[in-house]
Regions:
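Short acidic/proline- and small/hydrophobic-mixed sequence motifs that coincide with surface turns
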Residues: 221-224, 298-299, 315-320
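Short, solvent-exposed loop/linker segments at the N-terminal edge
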Residues: 199-206, 293-302
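Asparagine-centered strand-capping/turn motif at beta-strand->loop junctions
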Residues: 310-314
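Extracellular recognition modules
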Residues: 262-266, 309, 350
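Exposed beta-strand face motif in extracellular beta-rich ectodomains
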Residues: 257-261, 304, 347
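Short beta-strand elements bearing conserved aromatic residues within extracellular beta-rich modules
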Residues: 225-228, 321-325
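Intrinsically disordered, low-complexity Pro/Gly/Ser/Thr-rich segments with frequent PxxP/GP/PP motifs
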Residues: 330-351
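Extended, charged catalytic domains and RNA/DNA-binding interfaces, predominantly
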Residues: 1-284
Length: 351
């Protein structure tokens, strides 16, 4: 078809740029938007079956379409998750086959300057997708509607490959060799037990040896903190010593307690970057969906209710031993009632 032919012709020129062909499937007012790359053709959001928003029927139909043998070479991305465009029903409907078609999730989106209006970070949904079992790498894209293709702001996707070609880039994405950054020239290389970011350690080792190389060539930029993030967004380890950070060579050893480990880098000006995880063993698909305050405008010294929603996508019930609420390092309260989250269900705990 004409669009594939145009891409092939552009890439054949070998001019230092690579074109990747794809399309966006959208559900206006529905579960979300998805980019799909490397297919023989495209589909329309006006397709009656695919656009059916009743009980997410259209999203489920799209997952089924991608899961067909013809979709084996396709790569898809969860676009700008959040309250505006949708969270894919909090990343529901996971199964191993569709997981093998979804490779990325946006942690930032928009044409505005980083930290200003028109730029929409969504880092918490990256963690949610990982907690729900999806094997995805982070991206930070511009969603350009007004030109400035690629240079509207400093957000970048970084794909690690030694094969700078269309298929070489796709293979790197399939291996999740990626990180997303708000600083256009921040460099990160991350390994666990000498396996690079995006790897899956199927057998759980006795310990995890993490190594992080991080640098920014700009003299005005500095690294203020580097963290290891694990299930439910917990910080498992952090480096914040200025001298150690300035060396750009960081390492630590951790117990293999969690299902995934990714790196979060924060610069002195607030710019942030996150890497693809290294997964360890089988992902435990349970965690926190949301923490919501019942009062829209809280007032000091007035009582309010905080509701924590927990999910369990496993095939067996899960017991919550306790839920701890803290603020500024101070414990506000502990719910130790021993609640049970049903299999393939959720539980709300008010506090």
């Amino acid at each position: 078809n004409s669009y594939k032919t145009a891409i092939d012709a552009f890439n054949a020129e070998n001019n230092g740029k690579i074109a990747l062909g794809g399309f966006e499937m959208t559900w206006s007012g529905g579960p979300g938007h998805i980019n799909t790359f490397n297919t023989e053709g495209i589909v329309s959001r006006n397709n009656t079956a695919l656009n059916n928003k009743t009980d997410d029927a259209g999203l489920k139909a799209y997952y089924a379409l991608l899961s067909q043998p013809e979709g084996v070479d396709s790569l898809s991305q969860f676009n700008h998750p959040g309250s505006t465009f949708g969270t894919f029903s909090d990343f529901s409907y996971w199964d191993a086959l569709i997981d093998s078609r979804m490779y990325m999730v946006e942690v930032g989106n928009g044409e505005g300057a980083i930290g200003a209006g028109g730029y929409y970070p969504s880092y918490e949904y990256y963690t949610m997708a990982l907690d729900k079992g999806w094997h995805v790498a982070p991206t930070n894209n511009q969603d350009n509607h007004k030109g400035k293709w690629g240079n509207a702001n400093d957000a970048r996707d970084v794909i690690l490959t030694d094969d700078f070609s269309e298929q070489g880039i796709y293979e790197a994405i399939r291996s999740h060799r990626m990180y997303a950054t708000e600083d256009k020239n921040l460099e990160i290389y991350y390994t666990v037990n000498e396996q690079p970011l995006g790897s899956i350690l199927e057998e759980i080792p006795e310990e995890l040896s993490l190594s992080v190389q991080v640098s920014d060539p700009d003299r005005t930029d500095s690294i203020s903190k580097v963290e290891v993030i694990v299930n439910s967004g917990r910080v498992a380890y952090a480096w914040d010593d200025p001298a150690e950070l300035a060396s750009g060579l960081l390492s630590c050893t951790l117990d293999p307690t969690y299902s995934y480990y990714y790196i979060r880098v924060t610069e002195g000006d607030g710019d942030m970057a996150v890497t693809a995880p290294v997964w360890v063993g089988e992902t435990l698909k349970l965690g926190i969906s949301s923490v919501v305050c019942g009062t829209s405008t809280p007032v000091t010294d007035e009582e309010l209710t905080i509701t924590t929603t927990l999910f369990n996508s496993e095939s067996a019930d899960a017991t919550v031993k306790s839920v701890n609420y803290t603020s500024g390092g101070e414990t506000l309260g502990v719910d130790a009632a021993g609640n049970t989250i049903p299999a393939s269900g959720s539980l709300q705990i008010p506090f």
